[in-house]
A protein has these predicted regions:
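Short coil-to-beta strand junction motifs in C2/discoidin
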Residues: 65-73, 132
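Short beta-strand elements
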Residues: 129-141
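A glycine-anchored, Pro-Gly-centered beta-turn/N-cap motif
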Residues: 47, 109-111
């Protein structure tokens, strides 16, 4: 009996100490996010340009709105995907579009850059399964 109580207590302790975001908000398996513009290999003249973001089989909502099958865009610039069970960082390499934007005008210095989209839930955590685009490369002149 005592062993059963200790086992149950340990199981409960593990359950209660696991972060709430460890299992992301569910997403449809056929959902995908993509770039409308720019396209892979695009050459951008001047540092400022529009990024237009698309999403299929899910909807866009602002941060803080906890509905099923919705999220908001995050643009990853010159970086790898962050840990997919944690909130997406907010810095110069991880731009948040928490108001539900589907396009943005950004500025990058001259050179080769990579861009990738990652959809986040109401808490900026990637969905489960995560919804992200292929990484594209652009050149800014």
């Amino acid at each position: 009996m005592r062993t059963a109580l200790i086992t149950a207590a340990l199981a409960l302790a593990v359950f209660w100490t696991t972060p709430a975001f460890a299992a992301g908000t569910p997403s449809p398996k056929d959902a995908y996010v993509y770039f409308i513009w720019p396209s892979d290999g695009a050459v951008i003249h001047g540092g400022k340009f529009w990024v237009r973001m698309g999403l299929r089989n899910m909807g866009i909502s602002p941060r803080g709105v906890a509905l099923s099958d919705v999220g908001h865009h995050h643009l990853l610039i010159d970086t790898e995907l962050p840990p997919l069970t944690e909130p997406i960082p907010s810095d110069r390499n991880h731009l948040h579009f928490g108001a539900g934007e589907t396009e943005a005008r950004i500025e990058l210095p001259p050179g080769k850059h990579t861009l990738q989209l990652l959809l986040g839930d109401h808490n900026h955590v990637p969905h489960d399964p995560p919804v992200y685009s292929k990484k594209i490369s652009i050149i800014v002149q």
